[in-house]
Curated annotation (Swiss-Prot):
Gene3D superfamilies associated with the record: Vaccinia Virus protein VP39
Pfam families (alphabetical): Methyltransf_15
Protein name from the UniProt record: Uncharacterized protein L320
Coiled coil: none
A molecular function GO annotation: RNA cap trimethylguanosine synthase activity
Species in which this protein is naturally found: Acanthamoeba polyphaga mimivirus
Lineage, highest ranks first: Viruses, Varidnaviria, Bamfordvirae, Nucleocytoviricota, Megaviricetes
UniProt xrefs under InterPro entries: DNA_methylase_N6_adenine_CS, RNA_cap_Gua-N2-MeTrfase, SAM-dependent_MTases_sf
Length: 256
């Protein structure tokens, strides 16, 4: 019998059938089935395609589950009421568009794409999605997962997102989303956590992004114990909205 160790993806062979049966039962009780985990994480898809979804252990720990990804998209949509008219639209037509119609005219860039937790939801609603992932393996998984959902409006980049968007300013978008690493499980011990992303603080990343003329909104996914007083003070020249959802806080920073 072959037993799959879900957490490390190791194959273990046991010659004793009784031992096999006992261990199999124990593992079934303790370990979630990888197929069931994928079903929770990713948007609805056929069982055949779901089995082809690629994800690594680290991503399972930190990925945005589908239900939360939808909540984040809804938050962005609800903040589009006063969003400036893009250059490719007429002011009159823009004013008449509903938030979901406006979203279909906008481009969002995900700076921390991973294997697609938020990207796959964004692709359903936005005109285009730029998905940036630095890790080569996750970049491969990201491309695979996007293809399984038949999305043709996602451009993937295996690169440093800070370099692309801030130092080079190579990509064009209306909205930027990023989920900076929270520092592992130890982040929970802090009362007023502050985070860096690449070589900048999270606050400086927001400032530098919003200095670019084409970026009108920046959305962040942060832990609930973040130092929000500091964040609000550093970005007080912008409009900031804070939304608490399960186990995380979504911050919307607007320059309009």
């Amino acid at each position: 019998m072959i037993i799959m160790d879900y957490y490390h993806m190791d194959i273990i062979l046991y010659p004793n059938k009784n031992l096999q049966k006992s261990l199999t039962k124990r593992k079934c009780l303790k370990q979630p089935n990888i197929h069931s985990i994928k079903r929770l994480i990713f948007p609805p898809i056929t069982e055949t395609r779901l089995s082809k979804i690629m994800i690594d252990d680290e991503s399972i720990k930190y990925i945005t589950y589908n239900s939360s990804a939808q909540e984040i998209t809804n938050i962005i949509m609800n903040n589009l009421e006063n969003f400036p008219c893009p250059s490719h639209c007429s002011e009159e037509k823009w004013r008449l568009k509903s938030p979901d119609q406006r979203m279909k005219k906008l481009v969002i860039t995900e700076m921390t794409a991973g294997v697609g937790g938020n990207v796959l939801n964004f692709a359903k609603y936005f005109k285009y999605v730029n998905a940036i992932e630095l890790n080569c393996i996750r970049y491969k998984y990201l491309n695979n997962n996007i293809k399984l959902y038949d999305y043709s409006n996602v451009n993937c980049y295996n690169d440093n997102s800070v370099s692309l968007l801030i130092e080079k300013d190579d990509l064009g978008q209306d909205i930027v989303f990023f989920d900076p690493p929270w520092g592992g499980g130890g982040y929970k011990q802090f009362q007023n956590l502050r985070l860096d992303f690449d070589k900048y603080s999270v606050e400086v990343v927001c400032q530098k992004l919003l200095e670019k003329n084409h970026n009108k909104m920046v959305i962040l996914k942060l832990p609930s114990n973040y130092d929000f007083d500091y964040f609000f003070d550093q970005l007080k020249s912008y409009t900031i909205n804070k939304f608490d959802i399960e186990k995380m806080t979504i911050i919307v920073v607007k320059k309009y």
